[in-house]
Amino acid sequence: MDLFNYSRRETSEVNIGATPMGGSNPIRIQSMTNTATQDTEASVAQAKRIVDAGGEYVRLTAQGIKEAENLMNINAGLRRDGYMVPLVADIHFNPKVADVAAQYVEKVRINPGNYVDAARTFKHLEYTDEEYAQELQKIHDRFVPFLNICKKNHTAIRIGVNHGSLSDRIMSRYGDTPQGMVESCMEFLRICVKEDFTDVVISIKASNLSLIHISEPTR
């Protein structure tokens, strides 16, 4: 990579409300609220401040069903006041919350490390190839209904991989490696391709910089 003559890679355009990203669109600016998502007034007010400061997407956490349901009120409050900013719901641990949030926001972020797999316990797990395939089928069976909800509501998704929350299953098979991070994403991305769902954003991050160097063949 020539760091002094950088050029953007050609990417697919992803529809996120009325503010698409990727393709020939400019790099978008997103910020996240730190309000309680059940506090409609505070969340709307902070989202407005983000937009007024130049934010193009506003992300809110949705820890549970109640928070996900209240995204409808936050969205309505913003639109009522003329703020058409796309909202992004941040989901961890509970795919049912993602199902609800997808009905009220323009994009939903899921974490592959805890969307279907159990919370990380740092245990080494042994799988036969057949058992591993069964685990992948569980992901497929849970993820496809979510994609169908997103299709119905024109909701984009972000597959957001965190090195710190890779599942025990991925860690046991691939180790603490860039390949494990990539495969955690690809398990979900392959399903998106199979289901012809293209409004997908990908993020892969790690706090350990020595870990995020990914070789060209992997990329």
Regions found by a protein language model. Give the residues of each.
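Alpha-helix-loop-beta-strand connector modules within alpha/beta enzyme cores
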Residues: E67-V88, K138-K152
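Glycine-rich tight-turn/loop motif centered on a GG-T
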Residues: F4, V105-R142, R169-G180
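N-terminal amphipathic alpha-helix/helix-capping segment at the start of soluble metabolic enzymes
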Residues: M1-S31, K151
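Glycine-rich, proline-tolerant flexible connector loops at the mouths of alpha/beta enzymes
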Residues: N34, G55-L78, P112-E131, V200-S207
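Residue-level detector of conserved catalytic or cofactor/ligand-binding positions
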Residues: S210-R219
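Active-site mouth loops of central-metabolism enzymes
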Residues: N25-A42, L87-F93, I170-G180
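Hydrophobic faces of well-ordered beta-strands that scaffold small-molecule active sites
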Residues: I27-T33, V58-L60, L87-I91, V108-I110, ...
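Structured alpha-helical segments in the cores of large, soluble enzyme domains
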Residues: G17, T40-I50, A98, F146-K152, ...
